[in-house]
Regions:
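Short beta-strand element of the alpha/beta-hydrolase
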Residues: 456-467
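Hydrophobic beta-strand positions that form the internal "hydrophobic ladder"
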Residues: 47-50, 102, 146, 244, ...
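A flexible loop/linker signature enriched in serine peptidases of the S9 family
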Residues: 54-67, 83-91, 105-115, 123, ...
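Short loop/turn segments that connect beta-strands within beta-propeller blades
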Residues: 73-76, 118-122, 203-207, 267-271, ...
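Non-catalytic accessory segments flanking enzyme active sites
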Residues: 42, 147-149, 175-180, 184-203, ...
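Residue-level detector of Asp-centered blade-edge/turn motifs that repeat once per structural unit
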Residues: 45-46, 97-98, 141-142, 239-240, ...
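Active-site-proximal cap/loop segments of hydrolase catalytic domains
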Residues: 482, 487-488, 495-687
Length: 687
């Protein structure tokens, strides 16, 4: 397909004229699910171009579709060029070393394979044609080799064997599955015996992978990258292309209660992996070589089995293996990071007091300095002296911005996705506030006005409680829990980063473990009252509480321990019985850390804040929602909640999605979810 410049001037002018005449309106869930989603910016090696993804939503097909776009940054006003167009998505872009082609993943041929699109024109050509799907990949710095993850049976001699076994399983009339160790299921998928195995293969003169891929991690009983959310950030080529470093957890019988990921080094052509971090029993991951190849950076935790421990940056001398903690004194947890091209600093994102900022970290001293302002930086890329980042806020989905290293205050906006479609939408105004919470600590939260707020008026409250529990409900844009949907429906919203939230120092994050119903509930109570006192447009007498996951747990806890707090409650995938949760969730390292061990060794701590003991006090109307593919907080928890409500005659409804997991992701289901929730709120706050 020839590259085509998207020419929309006339259409946008007409659209702008129509929107100029349209009356302002509130934001709706239909707006939310139809929004185009910008992500994965990647600068070309010479920083002259950036390729990125845009996901659109087809409501008729009830699914999203992701394609690649490009901006030429040399232009005075860069215009978006669409690179790919197919019924199948195109994702995971990688630049060729010369910047003359883009590699990407697509299932346009029927299976997920690597493709190459020359920027000089012409159609995309398939680089791999393997019997199994390519899950993710990296291109070597020289462009002559791929590292890629494939889902295979480790005891198979070749890829064809794995394909044949999957096909045989599908045809087998007997459907029973036999397990002799955990995991038996993970997130939303039953285990079928396959592992993510890292392979390497050369690219021949014709631009194809013609030789059989060589396993790099197959001798390790584990997944590379990790399941369920790992990606190519968990493995990396060295600058000379001769070595691959990857992160893996040896599974064995302890996989379900271990977070001991180690870094392994292996020749890119195959060989025995060498453990680089055997001394650390906690999590080591996301290795990246410095530009000169002499230093290996990676993120590491210190406490085994604690998934919310602080990720700090470690630098390892490649020649000697000597390590030093770079950000040990910085009380923030590193999310994503990249080396600056000169090797003197690293760029990293981290939660920070209700924001998710981009920081520059000095490679010698470890000093961190913020280079982005308010908002949420979801992705970024750096090449030469240029940085491109995707940044969102509570008032807008992600857009791309460009700035020069050393001059972050002069960021240029590169994209205007969704702005024409939402030109007549008036978003709710929001503000961060603080108050004295549990232990007299400063706690932060946000409030948001309805889109049509008027002076002197009061508005019902949607009180949103985040999950995690080690997370943050800050200045970001969500396609699942978005306060603007409630603002668009006439509600004020209040959301608190209670004790246990991230971005306020590790001690604050740690403080929730073993205290799920203690300090967090106190913070929520004090935060609600502080907000009501500070913002007179909040109608405290007409409020409903909503939460998912840990937030759903908190809905059950509020039901029995703050029973006069709200007119109604919405509980999505929430914990009802902590004992049942401990024995049925899949990642049991989580519950064992939070409660000090397995249930049979720590009964008292599990039961201390167990909602099931307080159901006799339940009286607030509750909407219970559950995804039946949620193996993190299984369906039995929602059924227990609903049964307790119904048996006592408490007004209640149960909404179940048979085809959703812990999150509601399908567009039509998201619309149904929001309309059901808003109807529930309207029933009890509009009386």
């Amino acid at each position: 397909m020839k590259l085509r410049l998207l020419v929309l001037a006339a259409a946008l002018a007409a659209s702008g004229a129509q929107h100029a005449q349209a009356a302002p309106r509130g934001f709706t869930v239909e707006d939310l699910v139809k929004m185009e989603r910008v992500g994965s910016p990647l600068l070309s090696p010479d920083a002259s171009k950036v390729v990125y993804t845009v996901r659109t939503t087809n409501m008729d097909k009830n699914r999203g579709n992701t394609q690649l776009w490009m901006l030429d940054l040399r232009a005075a006003k860069p215009a978006p060029v669409r690179l790919t167009q197919a019924d199948a998505s195109s994702t995971d872009p990688e630049w060729s070393p010369a910047g003359d082609a883009v590699y990407f993943l697509s299932a346009r041929s029927g299976s997920n394979q690597v493709w190459r699109l020359p920027l000089s024109g012409g159609e995309a050509a398939r680089v791999t044609d393997l019997p199994v799907d390519v899950e993710n990949f990296r291109l070597s710095p020289q462009g002559d080799r791929l590292a890629m993850s494939l889902a295979v049976f480790r005891d198979c001699a070749d890829l064809a064997c794995s394909k044949a076994r999957v096909e045989a399983q599908a045809k087998d009339k007997a459907t029973g599955k036999v397990y002799d160790r955990l995991f038996v299921r993970h997130w939303d998928t039953w285990k079928d015996g396959r592992n993510n195995v890292l392979y390497s293969a050369p690219i021949d003169a014709a631009g194809k992978v013609s030789a059989a891929p060589v396993s790099l991690s197959g001798t390790i009983d584990g997944d590379v990258p990790s399941k369920p959310f790992g990606d190519h950030e968990e493995y990396q080529f060295s600058p000379d292309g001769k070595t691959v470093v990857f992160s893996a957890r040896v599974a064995g019988k302890t996989e379900a209660w271990s977070t001991n990921f180690d870094l392994y080094s292996v020749p890119a052509t195959g060989g025995a992996p060498r453990n680089l971090t055997a001394e650390n029993p906690a999590w080591d991951t996301k290795a990246q070589f410095s530009p000169d190849g002499k230093t290996l950076a990676y993120t590491a935790m210190q406490r085994p089995t604690f998934e919310a421990d602080r990720f700090h940056l470690v630098l390892m001398d490649v020649a000697t293996g000597k390590k030093r903690a770079l950000t040990g004194a910085w009380d923030r947890s590193v999310s994503d990071y990249r080396w600056a091209p000169d090797g003197k600093s690293l760029l990293a994102t981290a939660d920070d007091v209700g924001q998710h900022r981009l920081f520059s970290i000095d490679a010698a001293s470890g000093k961190a300095s913020a280079v982005s302002g308010l908002g949420y930086v979801s992705a970024f890329s750096v090449a030469r002296d240029t940085v491109v980042m995707a940044q969102a806020s509570l008032a807008a989905g992600a857009q791309l911005y460009k700035f020069k290293l050393g001059a972050p205050s002069k960021a240029d906006k590169l994209t205007n996705v969704n702005e024409a479609a939402l030109a007549d939408v008036r978003f709710g105004e929001y503000e961060q506030f603080s108050f004295k919470g549990a232990n007299g600590d400063t706690v932060y939260g946000h409030v948001m006005k309805p889109w049509n707020a008027q002076p002197g008026q009061k508005y019902p409250i949607a009180f949103l409680v985040h999950g995690g529990p080690q997370g943050s409900f800050g200045n970001s844009w969500s396609y699942r829990w978005n306060p603007q949907v409630y603002a668009g429906a006439g509600y004020a919203t209040v959301f608190i980063d209670f004790h246990g939230s991230t971005g306020y120092g590790q001690a604050f994050t740690d403080s929730i473990s073993g205290d799920w119903g203690g300090k967090p509930l106190e913070d929520l109570k004090k935060g609600m009252e502080a907000a009501a006192a500070k913002f007179p447009w909040l109608d405290r007498e007409r409020s409903c509480a909503l939460g998912a996951s840990y937030g759903g747990y908190m809905m059950n806890w509020i039901e029995g321990n703050w029973s006069d707090g709200f007119k109604c409650i919405v509980n999505h995938d929430g914990v009802f019985d902590i004992r049942g949760m401990a024995y049925s969730t899949e990642e049991i390292w989580f519950t064992e850390w939070e409660y000090g061990g397995p249930y049979y060794k720590a009964v008292e701590s599990h039961e201390k804040f167990n909602p099931v003991h307080h159901v006799a006090k339940w009286k607030t109307p509750m909407l219970v929602i559950q995804g039946d593919l949620d193996f993190r907080i299984p369906t039995a928890q929602a059924l227990g909640t609903f049964t307790a409500l119904q048996r006592q005659g408490v007004d209640s409804k149960l909404l179940v999605f048979p085809d959703e997991n812990h999150w509601v992701l399908k567009p039509a289901n998201s619309v149904q979810w929001h309309h059901t929730v808003l109807d529930w709120l309207n029933t009890y706050t509009r009386k």
